[in-house]
Amino acid sequence: PDTGVLKGYCYAAPWKARAAYRYTVETSIYLDANDRSKGFGNRLYTELLQRLQAQNIHSAVGILALPNPHSIRLHEKLGFEYAGCVKEAGFKFDRWIDVVYWQRILSHRIVSP
């Protein structure tokens, strides 16, 4: 049932400002800790990916702060592939955190500039 309580959200933003990267987006998803592993993330992300494909987006890059086993499992389940790690890229919770990149190619079509 719809309780009117926000369970989470996801969005996409341009990956880089330069025109050459206009077909790649950075994706983010946030879920309430009590609502993980209940299918909300899968439904949200699936809808986002469908909308991105409809907008002719070629590649989606999920950027995850570590540790984050729930988000890694979600990205794997949705067909993302591990694409790299940046060590100590951020600082939160009084410590340095590594960031990993997970990427999914949405379309192999060649787009005319």
Where do the PLM segments sit?
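Conserved acetyl-CoA-binding loop-helix of GNAT-fold acetyltransferases
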Residues: L31, S37-A54, S59, P69-K77
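Conserved catalytic-core motifs of GNAT/GCN5-like acyltransferases
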Residues: Y11, V61-L64, E76, E81-D98, ...
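Non-catalytic, surface-exposed connector residues within folded enzymatic/regulatory domains
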Residues: Y21-R22, K38, F80, W96
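Acetyl-CoA-dependent GNAT
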Residues: P1-N34, Y45, I105-L106
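Short hydrophobic/aromatic beta-strand or adjacent loop that forms the aromatic wall/cage
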Residues: E26, I97-Y101
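Flexible, glycine-/basic-rich loop-and-beta segments that form/coincide
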Residues: V111-P113
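Conserved hydrophobic beta-strand within the GNAT/NAT acetyltransferase core sheet
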Residues: T27-I29, A60-I63
